[in-house]
Amino acid sequence: MNPSFFLTVLCLGVASAAPKLDPNLDAHWHQWKATHRRLYGMNEEEWRRAVWEKNKKIIDLHNQEYSEGKHGFRMAMNAFGDMTNEEFRQVMNGFQNQKHKKGKLFHEPLLVDVPKSVDWTKKGYVTPVKNQGQCGSCWAFSATGALEGQMFRKTGKLVSLSEQNLVDCSRAQGNQGCNGGLMDNAFQYIKDNGCLDSEESYPYLATDTNSCNYKPECSAANDTGFVDIPQREKALMKAVATVGPISVAIDAGHTSFQFYKSGIYYDPDCSSKDLDHGVLVVGYGFEGTDSNNNKFWIVKNSWGPEWGWNGYVKMAKDQNNHCGIATAASYPTV
């Protein structure tokens, strides 16, 4: 991403005068820069520092309110600390919403008693948390996660699959590499192509290469199509319980999500329709002793293990389809 673009956007959102910086935060700022290996030009650093300080104040205020019982989740400074929320949404969130579903419709099992909690990470279905970098390829990570789970269900072997294969090769199905895409389009590419390479044979580069380097001899998975789940949390719950990890899209464009750390994520401003980020539901559960309260979805993100709850987020469950978690859910068939 061009640093000059970031600076231009930033300058539009901050007063033209030099920002007033808090000298008491000097040590924290230098430690954050060292941790995240940030190097700036002379003209950019104070603007980045101003954004970082603004984000830190938002985080500190939220956590103070959390300690007073006003929120159910904590926030923390992370690698996105020097990014405005506008930059964050442009760079990290690459899901492109679609109005018309193309897959088979999920038929909810009628005679199945679904458990009150499920966690597929404990059953061997889920690979370690990955990092999409500054590339809007969240859709590819969501798609590989769902297919990794279904292939494990079929073969008993967990193999990390290639997101770069999807980024480079699925444009004919409607995806746009680092500029966004859809999980269903990824599943369609895998069906059309006949297979998908492993992560080991086709490693992730976090960029558009403008060439497809798929190797048939390195094929590690395939699918026969995909299934779209009705836009209801009960249907999603049954799918997660009976099928495995499910690809979903959410509204992840809020500062509260950008700096989420732990607890059950709930933001009243979160939309159930304006979706911008593909993730993977790997289970669900509840906190405390009452299974009817404090319910959450276990969601695997693709921003590295340092973000959130070891790379995961607990998202509020049965709260009117909060953040649209059931709006665009699907999984591949194998």
Curated annotation (Swiss-Prot):
Q: Which residues form the propeptide?
A: 18-113
Record key words, sorted: Disulfide bond, Glycoprotein, Hydrolase, Lysosome, Protease, Signal, Thiol protease, Zymogen
| Signal peptide per UniProt | 1-17
Its subcellular locations are: Lysosome
Q: Does this UniProt record's set of keywords contain Cytoplasm?
A: no
Query: Which superkingdom is the protein from?
Result: Eukaryota
Gene Ontology terms: biological process = proteolysis involved in protein catabolic process
PROSITE patterns attached here? THIOL_PROTEASE_ASN, THIOL_PROTEASE_CYS, THIOL_PROTEASE_HIS
Family to which the UniProt record says this protein belongs: Belongs to the peptidase C1 family.
Could you identify this protein by its name? Cathepsin L2
What organism is recorded for this protein? Bos taurus
Which gene is annotated as encoding this protein in its UniProt record? CTSV
